[in-house]
C-alpha cells in the first residue's frame, strides 16, 4: 500500500498535477545549485518569466515613440490599464467595468472611503476586525479624524473569539447587529493576514446591508488566492494589491472594485483628470465628467511600467483558471496540514482554521516554546533555503501557491522542521 504521506507519493502527485507546467513560467531565487523552496507568495509573488519581455516592450516603445506612445498601437499607454481589466474581472468575479488597476491599496482605500464612508450624526461608526492590518487601521482612524470623529468612540473592533485567535461568523453577526444603528461602514478583510482565516464575504455583505451600512473589503490576501464573486455578492467596494498572489512585482499597482450599481451614482469622490471620461479628457474642460464604472475613480495616468508585469501574471491565471488553481490549493494546503499533524505535532500549532472554506493557501504556525523558539526555527528554515515569513509576535506563515509550489516542497519544509527539532 502506498504511504500517502511519503515523499514518493508527493513526487507522484507532482507528476500527475495538470498545472505542473506553470512552475516553469516563474523565476525562482536560488539556494546553492537548486531553486529556493519558496512559500512567500502571500508576501511577494515570484516573477513571471514573461514579465521582462512586457516591461522591455514598454521601454522599447518609449525609446522609439516617446510621447506618441500614448496614442499609437494596440498597447498604447492611453488605454494600457484596460489591457488588464478583463483578466482582473475574471479573477475577482466582477463585470469588466467594475474593476480598475490604479494607485496602491492604501491610496485606493482612502479614495473608496471618501465616497462610501458618509457619516451622519446618528450613523458614523466604522466596524473592523481587532488586529487589522496596520495600514487599514491607520486609514480608518485618519478618516474618522478627518470627519471630526474620535476613534475611541467611533471605531468598533470585533475581537477574536475562537481558541486559535480567529473570529467566528457569530461574533461578526452579533457585532453588526449590536452596533447596526450606528454603523456607516463595515470594512473587513477577505483573509486575515496574520491567522490566514478566510471569511464569507456574501454573508458579511448581507449582515451589513440589513443594518443600512456600506460594506467594503481589503482583499490583499484573497485576490488570486480564493475564487471571488464580488458582483454577485453585492460588495460596495473592494481594494487589493497585486504583488502577492498576482505576481506583479514589488510595489505593484493596486486594484479596486466598485459595484455596478454605483457606476452612475452621484457619490462624492476625490477626482483627478484620468478619471474624466476618455473621449473628452484631452479637451481639458474644467468640469469633471467621470468615466463610467470604477475607472471614474482614477486620478492620474496609469503607471504603464508597473502594469506590464501584471499583464504577464494575468495571462497565467487565464491559462489555469481560478477553479483549477483553487482545487490544487486545497490539496496542497490540506497535504501540508496532514504532514504537520503526522510528523511534527509537538513542534507546530496550526492557527489557521482547518475547514477549507475558512482558509486560503496559507497556514499560520506557532512554534512550541514561544517566540524565541519560533524565531530560531524561522532562521533555520531560511538558512536551509526554505522561505516562509514571520509576523509578530510569534507566527510563521507558510503559503503553498498552486501556480508554482509542488507537493514535494511540503516535504522539504517538514523535513527541515524535523531536523531542527531533533538538533
Swiss-Prot record:
<feature type="binding site">
    <location>
        <begin position="133"/>
        <end position="136"/>
    </location>
    <ligand>
        <name>pyridoxal 5'-phosphate</name>
    </ligand>
</feature>
<dbReference type="GO" id="GO:0019441">
    <property type="term" value="P:L-tryptophan catabolic process to kynurenine"/>
</dbReference>
<keyword id="KW-0663">Pyridoxal phosphate</keyword>
<feature type="binding site">
    <location>
        <position position="301"/>
    </location>
    <ligand>
        <name>pyridoxal 5'-phosphate</name>
    </ligand>
</feature>
<keyword id="KW-0378">Hydrolase</keyword>
<dbReference type="GO" id="GO:0043420">
    <property type="term" value="P:anthranilate metabolic process"/>
</dbReference>
<dbReference type="GO" id="GO:0009435">
    <property type="term" value="P:NAD biosynthetic process"/>
</dbReference>
<feature type="binding site">
    <location>
        <position position="218"/>
    </location>
    <ligand>
        <name>pyridoxal 5'-phosphate</name>
    </ligand>
</feature>
<feature type="binding site">
    <location>
        <position position="105"/>
    </location>
    <ligand>
        <name>pyridoxal 5'-phosphate</name>
    </ligand>
</feature>
<comment type="subunit">
    <text>Homodimer.</text>
</comment>
<comment type="function">
    <text>Catalyzes the cleavage of L-kynurenine (L-Kyn) and L-3-hydroxykynurenine (L-3OHKyn) into anthranilic acid (AA) and 3-hydroxyanthranilic acid (3-OHAA), respectively.</text>
</comment>
<comment type="similarity">
    <text>Belongs to the kynureninase family.</text>
</comment>
<dbReference type="InterPro" id="IPR010111">
    <property type="entry name" value="Kynureninase"/>
</dbReference>
<feature type="binding site">
    <location>
        <position position="106"/>
    </location>
    <ligand>
        <name>pyridoxal 5'-phosphate</name>
    </ligand>
</feature>
<dbReference type="GO" id="GO:0019805">
    <property type="term" value="P:quinolinate biosynthetic process"/>
</dbReference>
<feature type="binding site">
    <location>
        <position position="221"/>
    </location>
    <ligand>
        <name>pyridoxal 5'-phosphate</name>
    </ligand>
</feature>
<dbReference type="InterPro" id="IPR015424">
    <property type="entry name" value="PyrdxlP-dep_Trfase"/>
</dbReference>
<dbReference type="InterPro" id="IPR015422">
    <property type="entry name" value="PyrdxlP-dep_Trfase_small"/>
</dbReference>
<keyword id="KW-0662">Pyridine nucleotide biosynthesis</keyword>
<dbReference type="GO" id="GO:0030170">
    <property type="term" value="F:pyridoxal phosphate binding"/>
</dbReference>
<feature type="modified residue" description="N6-(pyridoxal phosphate)lysine">
    <location>
        <position position="244"/>
    </location>
</feature>
<dbReference type="GO" id="GO:0005737">
    <property type="term" value="C:cytoplasm"/>
</dbReference>
<protein>
    <recommendedName>
        <fullName>Kynureninase</fullName>
        <ecNumber>3.7.1.3</ecNumber>
    </recommendedName>
</protein>
<feature type="binding site">
    <location>
        <position position="243"/>
    </location>
    <ligand>
        <name>pyridoxal 5'-phosphate</name>
    </ligand>
</feature>
<dbReference type="InterPro" id="IPR015421">
    <property type="entry name" value="PyrdxlP-dep_Trfase_major"/>
</dbReference>
<feature type="binding site">
    <location>
        <position position="273"/>
    </location>
    <ligand>
        <name>pyridoxal 5'-phosphate</name>
    </ligand>
</feature>
<dbReference type="Pfam" id="PF22580">
    <property type="entry name" value="KYNU_C"/>
</dbReference>
<dbReference type="GO" id="GO:0097053">
    <property type="term" value="P:L-kynurenine catabolic process"/>
</dbReference>
<comment type="pathway">
    <text>Amino-acid degradation; L-kynurenine degradation; L-alanine and anthranilate from L-kynurenine: step 1/1.</text>
</comment>
<comment type="pathway">
    <text>Cofactor biosynthesis; NAD(+) biosynthesis; quinolinate from L-kynurenine: step 2/3.</text>
</comment>
<dbReference type="GO" id="GO:0030429">
    <property type="term" value="F:kynureninase activity"/>
</dbReference>
Amino acid at each position: 500500500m502506498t504511504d500517502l504521506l511519503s515523499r514518493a507519493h508527493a513526487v507522484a502527485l507532482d507528476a500527475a498535477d495538470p498545472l505542473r507546467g506553470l512552475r516553469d513560467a516563474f523565476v525562482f531565487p536560488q539556494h546553492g545549485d537548486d531553486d529556493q523552496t519558496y512559500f512567500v507568495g502571500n508576501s511577494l509573488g515570484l516573477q513571471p518569466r514573461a514579465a521582462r519581455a512586457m516591461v522591455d516592450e514598454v521601454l522599447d516603445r518609449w525609446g522609439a515613440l516617446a510621447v506618441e506612445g500614448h496614442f499609437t498601437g494596440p498597447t498604447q499607454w492611453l488605454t494600457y490599464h484596460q489591457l488588464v481589466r478583463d483578466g482582473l474581472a475574471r479573477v475577482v468575479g466582477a463585470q469588466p467595468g467594475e474593476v480598475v488597476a490604479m494607485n496602491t491599496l492604501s491610496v485606493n482605500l482612502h479614495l473608496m472611503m471618501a465616497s462610501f464612508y458618509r457619516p451622519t450624526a446618528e450613523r458614523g461608526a466604522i466596524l473592523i476586525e481587532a488586529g487589522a492590518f496596520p495600514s487599514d487601521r491607520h486609514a480608518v482612524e485618519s478618516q474618522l479624524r478627518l470627519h471630526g470623529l474620535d476613534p475611541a468612540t467611533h471605531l468598533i473592533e470585533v475581537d477574536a473569539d475562537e481558541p486559535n485567535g480567529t473570529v467566528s461568523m457569530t461574533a461578526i453577526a452579533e457585532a453588526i447587529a449590536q452596533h447596526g444603528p450606528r454603523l456607516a461602514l463595515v470594512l473587513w478583510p477577505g483573509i486575515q493576514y496574520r491567522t490566514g482565516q478566510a471569511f464569507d464575504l456574501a454573508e458579511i455583505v448581507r449582515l451589513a446591508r440589513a443594518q443600512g451600512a456600506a460594506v467594503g473589503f481589503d482583499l490583499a490576501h484573497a485576490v488570486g488566492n480564493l475564487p471571488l464573486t464580488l458582483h454577485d455578492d453585492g460588495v460596495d467596494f473592494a481594494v487589493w494589491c497585486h504583488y502577492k498572489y498576482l505576481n506583479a512585482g514589488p510595489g505593484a499597482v493596486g486594484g479596486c472594485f466598485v459595484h455596478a450599481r454605483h457606476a452612475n451614482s452621484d457619490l462624492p469622490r476625490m477626482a483627478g483628470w484620468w478619471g474624466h471620461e476618455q473621449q473628452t479628457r484631452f479637451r481639458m474642460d474644467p468640469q469633471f465628467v467621470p468615466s463610467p464604472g470604477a475607472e471614474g475613480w482614477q486620478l492620474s495616468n496609469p503607471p504603464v511600467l508597473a502594469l506590464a508585469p501584471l499583464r504577464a501574471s494575468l495571462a497565467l491565471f487565464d491559462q489555469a483558471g481560478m477553479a483549477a488553481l483553487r482545487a490544487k490549493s486545497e490539496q496542497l494546503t490540506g497535504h501540508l496540514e496532514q504532514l504537520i499533524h503526522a510528523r511534527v505535532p509537538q513542534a507546530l500549532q496550526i492557527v489557521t482554521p482547518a475547514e477549507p472554506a475558512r482558509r486560503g493557501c496559507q497556514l499560520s504556525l506557532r512554534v512550541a516554546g514561544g517566540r524565541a523558539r519560533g524565531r530560531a526555527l524561522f532562521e533555520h528554515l531560511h538558512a536551509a533555503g526554505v522561505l516562509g515569513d514571520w509576523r509578530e509576535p510569534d507566527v510563521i506563515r507558510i503559503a503553498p501557491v498552486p501556480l508554482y509550489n509542488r507537493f514535494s516542497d511540503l516535504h522539504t519544509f517538514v523535513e527541515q522542521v524535523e531536523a531542527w527539532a531533533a538538533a
